Amino acid sequence: MSEIIWDLALIQKYNHSGPRYTSYPTALEFNENYTNEDFIRAAARYPERPLSLYVHIPFCHKLCYFCGCNKVITRHRHKVEIYLDYLEREIKTRAPLFQNRLVTQIHWGRGTPTYLDEDQSARLMQMLRANFDVSDDAEISIEMDP
């Protein structure tokens, strides 16, 4: 068996913490200087391109120490309904800005989207389909933690 040769210069080059890209634009881009008008202008760009939707589900039963996502650790399942109510308001407010764009991808991210029960998952999917033009063959994915 051949011996592993470590490139010390390469190790030292990358031996530091880097940024975590858990969203785009990154969370730091959203601040008091980013206005609703900025959002509307950004939404109007590239009207011919298909749209990808990301839905953040922040709920988890327990804390995973590796996770850097925005999360709510709770066993109070009623909080999901409150969150979905607010999410529905946001979707209804923002969806008209994208009315002529076909949704080809939907991704549910963490916390743990599997925290939602079957009815809540169906409710969320119905919200998206009712407010966006979702392609029949859209790629739909969900993050999960067994």
Swiss-Prot record:
Annotated keywords: 4Fe-4S, Cytoplasm, Iron, Iron-sulfur, Metal-binding, Oxidoreductase, Porphyrin biosynthesis, S-adenosyl-L-methionine
Cofactor detail note: Binds 1 [4Fe-4S] cluster. The cluster is coordinated with 3 cysteines and an exchangeable S-adenosyl-L-methionine.
Keyword field contains tRNA-binding: no
Database matches in InterPro entries: Coproporphyrinogen-III_oxidase
Pathway the protein takes part in: Porphyrin-containing compound metabolism; protoporphyrin-IX biosynthesis; protoporphyrinogen-IX from coproporphyrinogen-III (AdoMet route): step 1/1
Binding site for S-adenosyl-L-methionine 2: 66, 111-112
Entry-linked SUPFAM superfamilies: Radical SAM enzymes (SSF102114)
Cofactor: [4Fe-4S] cluster
GO cellular component, one term: cytoplasm
Residues the record lists as binding S-adenosyl-L-methionine 1: 54, 143
Compartments where found: Cytoplasm
Name of this chain's protein: Oxygen-independent coproporphyrinogen III oxidase
Species whose genome carries this gene: Mannheimia haemolytica
